[in-house]
Swiss-Prot record:
This is UDP-N-acetylglucosamine--peptide N-acetylglucosaminyltransferase 110 kDa subunit. It comes from Homo sapiens (Human). Catalyzes the transfer of a single N-acetylglucosamine from UDP-GlcNAc to a serine or threonine residue in cytoplasmic and nuclear proteins resulting in their modification with a beta-linked N-acetylglucosamine (O-GlcNAc). Glycosylates a large and diverse number of proteins including histone H2B, AKT1, AMPK, ATG4B, CAPRIN1, EZH2, FNIP1, GSDMD, KRT7, LMNA, LMNB1, LMNB2, RPTOR, HOXA1, PFKL, KMT2E/MLL5, MAPT/TAU, TET2, RBL2, RET, NOD2 and HCFC1. Can regulate their cellular processes via cross-talk between glycosylation and phosphorylation or by affecting proteolytic processing. The gene is OGT. Changing T404V: Reduced autoglycosylation. Ubiquitinated by the SCF(FBXO31) complex, leading to its proteasomal degradation. Phosphorylation on Ser-3 or Ser-4 by GSK3-beta positively regulates its activity. Phosphorylation at Thr-454 by AMPK promotes nuclear localization.
């Protein structure tokens, strides 16, 4: 405000009076500068009475009245000054100040510009003009005003600092920095410039330089409140919490009632985990500033962290009453609603937060997470991308987007997201865990283990990472601290179930750990409830179901739902069943959850089912369920359970009146929306029915089935070469199979038919015997040619016009057949030498994935090998990284390395065929060989098993019971070892058992797909009749046996 009194020289009074006037004027000016406006006005009025036309006095009076907010009086005296001197720039500037204060910015600017035209070197005029231009939004004009002032006086460091502030606000940080540096060069002790420079460095991410400059500012001015606040803020962001606390406390010593500083200090306490202290400090901030929505929001965060969720919710609501557009409170309240299961309200609040603040990255990410949970993956992806666009270093958004892409089967996209999240935040435990899951699913187990371990180092209390690491270690048979690991895993599950959280152990893995039946069922139940949560948001009314078969012309409509209609073990087992249903009584629908993989398995099911619907083209669960209901399905069969590719949400919507679990998943669904589990008395004894959420529906023999007779008909017969010619015939050293085997054998001279004693299908191998004919080719030139082909690694030779193929080098002709699935068209030779198996040893085998082996199983196997000296164990590199671990543990148990032989995983046909070379299969009690059990039995190899308490541990016993080989089922560990040892040491007994298995696989119901289908139909009809009579689902444990002739 211009307040010059320098016009006294114009006075015509005598010198004495002039001196008196001059002294009074200087006194008034000093009082004005000191802020004693009352005294300054009193003395100025004396001066004005002496010289009413003195423009200096008029200017000072104008300034005094302006400072006292008496704007009209200020304007009056400025106007009087202008009347006295129309060229008085300071008067126009003072009048401009009045207009600016009244909000009349254009009038203010015009007066400032007029002042500067009158006096181009008027520094205060430029400064006042700059302030008015800023208020009017003309930032560039304000910059030019400051620049003009500095052209007249480059040493005005305060002005240069103000120019820097303006440039900083415009985002021109380098220019702002230059201004502050010049101000400091001019006045090195100018604390404000040091603080402002610290703000620029902070904005540029130069945290340490920012800290240095704020500290310099408070050193220069120990009472510089704003600098202490800025220092505290940057230290807080840098997570240097102790020093941040010290800075905020110093600020509070200067201004004890500064609510914002109390709020910021509380934030630091919160980050330090001092929740109670944070709560008290937030409450103090609110006490000082009751209408402080930020403080209420942050207080709510702390209360929520403490577990006071209801009080936190109240605080968020208070913040929103104070400020209905408080985006953080909307977002955080949505988080609470989400955790309470009120998903719709959560979505509404997230959307409201984004309506208020469209660039709110966290709200985009949170909304995306809920949308993902609802199955709205494309919309979720859009919001994650928005979050990342807004905040390119938002590691959580990258990690969560990776989860969505993973669910959409975009593995590479997910991998890139997790990798980027870790690049942004190397200490982001969740991202390391998610990356590990990608490696795990891709079979890169060592990388998965490393990433899970990194996650646990960063976040030791991380149940998901711990349980997934435990599963990875199980896959590769790393049993370091095995017992301790199992105890901790059980403890984690117990704690999660108690707190009603989703357990970190997946239902499909629960069979591998020493969990109680109640825990396993509860784990499945939680996952079933997740499906219900997803479908509840669809608000679909319940479907109305038919009570009779009128609309289907008296036929029962059965729908099989699976993601495995293709080259998958489930299709290998059941591919013929859809086409074997009685078309007069059943109408079969197959609902595929996965795209066509182009294999014959898919083609067969598509061709033989009455209807084949690809639901992978209908990603919306509601619409997919509508399609099933529109088809009028009576019994909907769940073949996935909780395996990869499942869509249990379809079943949660209940599009069919009866819903049953079958074949593809070895356990209970735990879900209220599944009525039955199709099983059998051996697999699921009635006395353990409480292990299942479903009602038990028994098949008369076994619930398991294999389509091996259709897929591998060339293995129905075999011939062997008597390579030793010592009178002892081995049926599994050099084996020939083929569709044209009989014709080939008829072309050979000297083929002997050896009658092998074969027990009938009784309870043991000593029951009445029948003879089994086995063709034996003696050692002659033909046999030698076959052996030479194998030894030289030839692919094929021709004998008597028949092509003879090396079993290790089979080729396929049909491109639509999955690799290794085609039935060989030649005579195929399989030998122990091809796999490095000793010719003169007893070969025990197990072709399961290695995760099914546990320390106690390997110990049993080691005991067996020790008791059968001339024996080896044949395992698969499934995966290869498990081989050295198994070998090391076996050596620790006293077994030389050469007693265990590993082979690579083979294509399906070779895998089944080479099973003929083993003498005995040793099943894994923890989780049996299910499909692999069927494979080895079709090869004619006996399987020793010991049923446990879970469904997964009793399947092999069910298969053997159906086969009529009860003597291979052990009641305990000792009996398991004894049975295996007897088979390995009593060669006559081994022959009898092998002969029995070879015979029974054809004559028993185990591989009789047609009979199985008829029995399954009888069970379906029983379910329907029970439902049609108005009954709720109930156990069906008295199956009706059906013969194929029926």
């Amino acid at each position: 405000m211009a307040s010059s009194v320098g016009n006294v020289a114009d006075s015509t009074e005598p010198t004495k009076r002039m001196l008196s006037f001059q002294g009074l004027a200087e006194l008034a000016h000093r009082e004005y500068q000191a802020g004693d406006f009352e005294a300054a006005e009193r003395h100025c009025m004396q001066l004005w009475r002496q010289e009413p036309d003195n423009t200096g006095v008029l200017l000072l009076l104008s300034s005094i009245h302006f400072q006292c907010r008496r704007l009209d009086r200020s304007a009056h005296f400025s106007t009087l000054a202008i009347k006295q001197n129309p060229l008085l720039a300071e008067a126009y500037s003072n009048l401009g100040n009045v207009y600016k204060e009244r909000g009349q910015l254009q009038e203010a600017i015009e007066h400032y510009r007029h002042a500067l035209r009158l006096k181009p070197d008027f520094i205060d005029g430029y400064i006042n003009l700059a302030a008015a231009l800023v208020a009017a939004g003309d930032m560039e004009g304000a910059v030019q005003a400051y620049v003009s002032a500095l052209q007249y006086n480059p040493d005005l460091y305060c002005v240069r600092s103000d120019l820097g502030n303006l440039l900083k606000a415009l985002g021109r940080l380098e220019e702002a920095k230059a201004c502050y540096l010049k101000a400091i060069e001019t006045q090195p002790n100018f604390a404000v410039a040091w603080s402002n420079l610290g703000c620029v460095f902070n904005a540029q991410g130069e945290i340490w330089l920012a800290i240095h400059h704020f500290e310099k500012a408070v050193t220069l001015d120990p009472n510089f409140l704003d600098a202490y606040i800025n220092l505290g803020n940057v230290l807080k962001e840098a997570r240097i919490f102790d020093r941040a606390v010290a800075a905020y406390l110093r600020a509070l010593s200067l201004s004890p009632n500064h609510a914002v500083v109390h709020g910021n200090l509380a934030c630091v306490y919160y980050e330090q985990g001092l929740i109670d202290l944070a709560i008290d400090t937030y409450r103090r901030a609110i006490e000082l500033q009751p209408h402080f929505p930020d403080a209420y929001c942050n207080l709510a965060n702390a209360l929520k962290e403490k577990g006071s969720v209801a009080e936190a919710e109240d605080c968020y609501n208070t913040a929103l009453r104070l400020c209905p557009t408080h985006a953080d409170s909307l977002n955080n309240l949505a988080n609470i609603k989400r955790e309470q299961g009120n998903i719709e309200e959560a979505v509404r609040l997230y959307r409201k937060a984004l309506e208020v603040f469209p660039e709110f990255a966290a709200a985009h990410s949170n909304l995306a997470s809920v949308l993902q949970q609802q199955g709205k993956l494309q919309e979720a992806l859009m919001h994650y991308k928005e979050a990342i666009r807004i905040s390119p270093t938002f590691a959580d958004a990258y990690s969560n987007m990776g989860n969505t892409l993973k669910e959409m089967q975009d593995v590479q996209g997910a991998l890139q997201c997790y990798t980027r999240a870790i690049q942004i935040n190397p200490a982001f435990a969740d991202a390391h865990s998610n990356l590990a899951s990608i490696h795990k699913d891709s079979g890169n187990i060592p990388e998965a283990i490393a990433s899970y371990r990194t996650a646990l180092k960063l976040k030791p209390d991380f149940p998901d990472a711990y349980c997934n690491l435990a599963h990875c270690l199980q896959i590769v048979c790393d049993w370091t601290d095995y017992d301790e690991r199992m105890k901790k895993l059980v403890s984690i599950v117990a704690d999660q179930l108690e707190k009603n959280r989703l357990p970190s152990v997946h239902p499909h893995h629960s069979m591998l750990y020493p969990l109680s039946h109640g825990f396993r069922k509860a784990i499945a139940e939680r996952h079933g409830n997740l499906c219900l949560d997803k479908i509840n948001v669809l608000h679909k009314p319940p479907y109305e179901h038919p009570k009779d078969l009128k609309l289907s012309d008296g036929r029962l409509r059965v729908g099989y739902v699976s993601s495995d209609f293709g080259n998958h073990p489930t299709s290998h087992l059941m591919q013929s069943i859809p086409g074997m249903h009685n078309p007069d009584k059943f109408e079969v629908f197959c609902y595929a959850l996965s795209p066509d993989d182009g294999t014959n398995f898919r083609v067969k099911v598509m061709a033989e089912a009455n209807h084949f619907i690809d639901l992978s083209q209908i990603p919306c669960n509601g619409k997919a369920a509508d399609r099933i209901h529109q088809d009028g399905i009576h019994i909907l069969v769940n073949m996935n359970g909780y395996t990869k590719g499942a869509r249990n949400e379809l079943f949660a919507l209940r599009p069919a009146p009866i819903q049953a679990m079958w074949l593809g998943y070895p356990g209970t669904s735990g879900a209220l929306f599944m009525d039955y589990i199709i099983t059998d008395q051996e697999t699921s004894p009635a006395e353990v029915a409480e292990q299942y959420s479903e009602k038990l529906a028994y098949m008369p023999h076994t619930f398991f089935i294999g389509d091996h007779a259709n897929m591998f008909p060339h293995l129905k017969k075999k011939a062997v070469i008597d390579f030793k010619s010592n009178g002892h015939i081995y049926d599994n050293r050099i084996v020939l199979n083929g569709i044209d085997l009989k014709a080939f054998l008829d072309s050979l001279p000297d083929v002997k038919i050896v009658k092998m004693k074969c027990p009938d299908g009784g309870d043991n191998a000593d029951s009445s015997n029948t003879a089994l004919n086995m063709p034996v080719i003696p050692m002659n030139t033909i046999a030698e040619a076959v052996i030479e082909m194998i030894n030289r690694g030839q692919i094929q030779i021709t004998i008597n016009g028949f092509s003879i193929s090396n079993g290790l080098a089979t080729t396929q002709i049909n491109n639509k057949a999955a690799t290794g699935e085609e039935v060989p068209r030649t005579i195929i030779v399989t030998t122990r030498s091809q796999y490095g198996l000793p010719e003169d040893a007893i070969v025990y085998c197990n072709f399961n994935q290695l995760y099914k082996i546990d320390p106690s199983t390997l110990q049993m196997w080691a005991n067996i090998l020790k008791r059968v000296p001339n024996s080896v164990l044949w395992l698969l590199r499934f995966p290869a990284v498990g081989e050295p671990n198994i070998q090391q543990y076996a050596q620790n148990m006293g077994l030389p390395q050469n007693r265990i032989i590993f082979s690579p995983v083979a294509p399906k046909e070779e895998h089944v065929r080479r099973g003929q070379l083993a003498d005995v299969c040793l099943d894994t009690p923890l989780c049996n060989g299910h499909t692999t059990g069927m494979d080895v039995l079709w090869a004619g190899t006996p399987m020793v098993t010991m049923p446990g308490e879970t469904l997964a541990s009793r399947v092999a016993a069910s298969q053997l019971t159906c086969l009529g080989c009860l003597e291979l089922i052990a009641k305990n560990r000792q009996e398991y070892e004894d049975i295996a040892v007897k088979l390995g040491t009593d060669l006559e007994y081994l022959k009898k058992v092998r002969g029995k298995v070879w015979k029974q696989r054809i004559s028993s119901p185990l591989f009789n797909t047609k009979q199985y289908t008829m029995e399954l139909e009888r069970l379906y009809l029983q379910m329907w009749e029970h439902y049609a009579a108005g009954n709720k689902p109930d156990h069906m444990i008295k199956p009706v046996e059906v013969t194929e002739s029926a």
